[in-house]
Amino acid sequence: MASNFLTKLFGSRNDRLLKQYRKTVARINAMEPEYEKLSDDALRAKTVEFQGRVARGESLDDLLPEAFAVGREASKRVMKMRHFDVQLLGGMALHHGKISEMRTGEGKTLTATLPVYLNALGGKGVHVVTVNDYLANRDARWMGRLYNFLGLTVGINLPQMPREEKQAAYAADITYGTNNEYGFDYLRDNMVYEARDRVQRALNFAIVDEVDSILIDEARTPLIISGQAEDHTAMYIAMNKVVPLLVRQEGEADPRTGEGVTKPGDFTIDEKSHQVFLTEQGHETAERVLAAQGLIPEGASLYDPSHITLMHHLYAALRANHLYHRDQHYVVQNGEIVIVDEFTGRLMSGRRWSEGLHQAVEAKEGVEIQAENQTLASITFQNYFRLYSKLSGMTGTADTEAYEFQEIYGLETVVIPPNRPSKRDDQLDRVYKTTREKYEAAIQDIRECHERGQPVLVGTTSIENSEIIDDLLNKAGLPHQVLNAKQHAREADIVAQAGRAGMITIATNMAGRGTDIVLGGNIEKEVAAIEDDESLDEATKQARIAALREQWAADNEKVKALGGLRIIATERHESRRIDNQLRGRSGRQGDPGSSRFYLSLDDSLMRIFAGERVRAIMERLKMPDGEAIEAGIVTRSIESAQRKVEARNFDIRKQLLEYDDVANDQRKVIYQQRNEILDAADLSGVIAGMRESCLTDIVRQYVPEESVEEQWDLAGLEKALADEWQIRLPLQQEVESAQAITDGEILEKVVAAGNAAFQAKVDMVGPENFHQFQRAVLLQSFDSNWRDHLSALDYLRQGIHLRGYAQKQPKQEYKREAFELFRQLIDQVKNEVTRILLTVQVQSPSELDQAAEALESRAEQIANVTYTAPTETGEPETLPDPRTAGAGGDGLNLPEGVRIGRNDPCPCGSGKKYKQCHGKLA
């Protein structure tokens, strides 16, 4: 009560904002006469003047009145459209990073041109986000004329585009595209192996059209890129045959004397750390056996750069055969390996070991080796759009979700008044007892409208409902057209004509969004066809266009006299916003119109939330069959039911976000590190830091910090350094010969020895040549471990709710365990990279180049890449890879199963390497 009184006294926050904006509108209007006098060239020159002022430090806020005035004047000349004052208000809200709620037909597309123009002056790029490719293409071409006139460049970002075209689209001042494509490009940019292959710039400013659809309806499902890593089935089988030929060593050798081995062998097992290590004899045996099998050339070393992956497979096979035992660590069930939880003894169906171990166990047991389908990258729309420095959006219906926009995105909603007050008559809902009665009443209403020539739009909540009404109208002999939100371009044409006299159009709620329904029909296509007809002279063109417009004006008046567009809906959507969108398609720009919802007690929303209450009212009133109840109390109880559903859906989205925020913080760290690696000219500092950290960890296992000599296990340390890192250091001798030595000095000696061993490899081929190899090793390790980490987070997320039964907070437990998993990921990358760089045997620069290429190519050879994105209802939908990973998705017609190496000559005959030619498109 008190808040209502204060609002009346001081005005709402919305009123105060609009009052502030109207002062600026007055300034813009005052400039109009001055700008009307400018020539086209002088008006265009204003852009260069503004860009100079921004470069010198003037803020965009200060430029706003002049830039908006220039944008409006240019629109009058190029588009033959003048921005209304309310469109200026909407544009200001967008520039200030708010959501602009403008009713359908108020010209949102034109409104956006002003803040887009203003923000593009900064040179950092503006992204306009639409719900489908058709609208992105249409708006970019339509509004692009205005931007080009003002000297700005426009790009369209579509799927299937080659990389160079995408880069050009993002480099433009203004880029149009869909939410899915922007998100997928961001993920793909964080999977590239060369900085020059990235397509996006820094994310500066985005205006999201139909912001409620994108940031709310589609926010329940994340964008996911998944695929199968390169198929190594043959390699796992081959390695499984090598393992029985290697013999386990019994007893541990003293690094100084070599004594202690009771039976020499090829590998040792460390039960404590669950690891297997090859002995020197084992390396020789393995090399001999692998050469005999044709897996490596005669006389080659396992530590050659080109054989790094062989070591990985050999160790996986050794661990599978000697550390993982059937019916203890796993069981074989229906031809699959199922992991056994070591703590509970339960079977963990669906989970797989990483690092190739699962495939190695499959090879050991002789079951089918499954190429693992992994999540390669994923992000939710909430987290993607929060990466922009400034975000804003526009829609016809945001006010019902204003709380969510503020809570999740920090976006305030500003309700912009219509240019002309609405004359639409929103009639009370009619509720029937049964579905049959509801449909009969709706068809009767449609028939009456059709007989008098009034156009009707029938809105449905699903394709299934559309088909029911389609069938009923066919039986009633009423001509109509059906739209089901699939062919966006055809949709727009049908929706544009839905306002013609006598038209009946059935549409699902989402179909044809972004296209206005003009009373009397839309004649712009016919006008454009006449203008493009080269066989007609100018006078004939003008005469025909004038006749068309005259006919349209008569049709328009006729439809207005009949009551405008009639909206008939046969079900309430679970969101009030979607119902309001449907209503908003009628009564645009002050046109007449009407809407009515026909409901039954059998409708799912009524049945679940409001049915009992309304049924009780009907029974109390003793309503006969076929009679409807039409009362404010019923409509209010339905809206209250919708509010309950909206609140539940908000909680689902909020919970998804709370869990994804954990992964998001980690994603930012990984992607930032990845980008730094890609851009760095010198990685020696990063590598040195990793090496020092690894060697410190290993030293501290055997020589604890601030410990005395009696607590040291120098023999164990020497062995670990030699086995795992190939650092041979006579620490025991040095300690015995030294007067006094501290644990810190031991650590210094080990780090110095590691640095020297590493530097010797760099000196052999030169820092330049070693840089590319280091970078490939780092990126490959980051990527493969990040993929495994995403799978681990998925598994953790699936079972975390069970912690609630143990009186623990699932979200807190998830955060804690996800952090621990992330710490393990960083340690794993550190150890993996350091081990490879310390143990690799370098012979020549060319060999190192080949190894780097092989690593990059292995990382990029991911088969069956699929893209999962939300549909317009928020349900997940799997899309094929628009680029088709590997050869064949690049315009080359290759026989099935043929793959081209990155360094092979391109089959197109250009003479270039495949990676520099058609491989770029793959």
From Swiss-Prot:
Monomer and homodimer. Part of the essential Sec protein translocation apparatus which comprises SecA, SecYEG and auxiliary proteins SecDF-YajC and YidC. It is a peripheral membrane protein. NCBIfam families: PRK12904.1, secA. Residues 867-912 are annotated as: Disordered. Part of the Sec protein translocase complex. Interacts with the SecYEG preprotein conducting channel. Has a central role in coupling the hydrolysis of ATP to the transfer of proteins into and across the cell membrane, serving both as a receptor for the preprotein-SecB complex and as an ATP-driven molecular motor driving the stepwise translocation of polypeptide chains across the membrane. GO terms for biological process: intracellular protein transmembrane transport; protein import; protein targeting; protein transport by the Sec complex. The lineage of its organism: Bacteria, Pseudomonadati, Pseudomonadota, Betaproteobacteria, Burkholderiales. The keyword Amino-acid biosynthesis does not apply. It is found in: Cell inner membrane; Cytoplasm. Keywords: ATP-binding, Cell inner membrane, Cell membrane, Cytoplasm, Membrane, Metal-binding, Nucleotide-binding, Protein transport, Translocase, Translocation, Transport, Zinc. May bind 1 zinc ion per subunit. One of its GO terms (molecular function) is ATP binding. Its main location: membrane. One of its GO terms (cellular component) is cytosol. It catalyses: ATP + H2O + cellular proteinSide 1 = ADP + phosphate + cellular proteinSide 2. Belongs to the SecA family. Its cofactor is Zn(2+). ATP binds at residues 87, 105-109, 516. It is an enzyme of class 7 (translocase). This is Protein translocase subunit SecA.
